[in-house]
A protein has these predicted regions:
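Iron-sulfur-associated redox domains of electron-transfer enzymes in respiratory
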Residues: 1-174
Length: 174
């Protein structure tokens, strides 16, 4: 779940601005059948660490600068379509969605962690461009798609309503 999704969901249901609704979202997702729920804030930190290392490496080795982020698939498409000369400036790092999906899929490849279940990684993002990111060639590990499904904030809200959940009254879960 992306941070912007949390804010939009709380706003949609008229909840107090600035108050975290992540626990309520976790509850709703569990009621809809999700086993585990992860926040992309963790993987955003991983992305920043990787981009920092890449930036330092570029400085030390005199490689192409400035370093442009690759976190937003719409931005990457814009650069690759309109400004091809800046493609070498794009970071090679995955987005937080891509990082989290790869980490979770790798962890649950181990049968001890998977508990006999197949891991399906569903990403909840504010932007439809994340759907295209999930099927890019660099979003696969060993031939397997890392992010299986991407749903938008609007789609999540529709799911909550279709399940008949009264979001405002849900108790927070961890």
């Amino acid at each position: 779940i992306a941070p912007a999704v949390r804010v939009a969901v709380g706003d949609h249901y008229g909840l107090t601005k600035g108050k975290s609704v992540m626990g309520k979202i976790v509850n709703a997702l569990h009621r809809m059948g999700f086993d585990e729920v992860y926040d992309t804030s963790f993987s955003a930190d991983l992305t920043i660490m990787e981009e920092s290392a890449e930036f330092l490496d570029r400085i030390k080795k005199g490689k192409k600068l400035p370093l442009l982020t690759s976190c937003c698939p719409a931005w990457v498409k814009f650069i690759t379509d309109q400004y091809k000369e800046y493609i070498p400036n794009l970071s090679t790092c995955r987005s937080p969605q891509g990082m989290l999906s790869a980490v979770i899929k790798e962890y649950f490849r181990d049968p001890e962690h998977a508990g006999g279940k197949k891991t399906v990684m569903i990403s909840i993002m504010p932007c439809t461009a994340k759907k295209a990111e999930a099927v890019r060639p660099n979003s696969f590990t060993d031939g397997e798609q890392d992010t299986d499904i991407v749903i938008t904030t609007t789609e999540l809200l529709r799911m909550i309503d279709n399940f008949g959940l009264d979001f405002a009254t849900l108790d927070p879960e961890a």
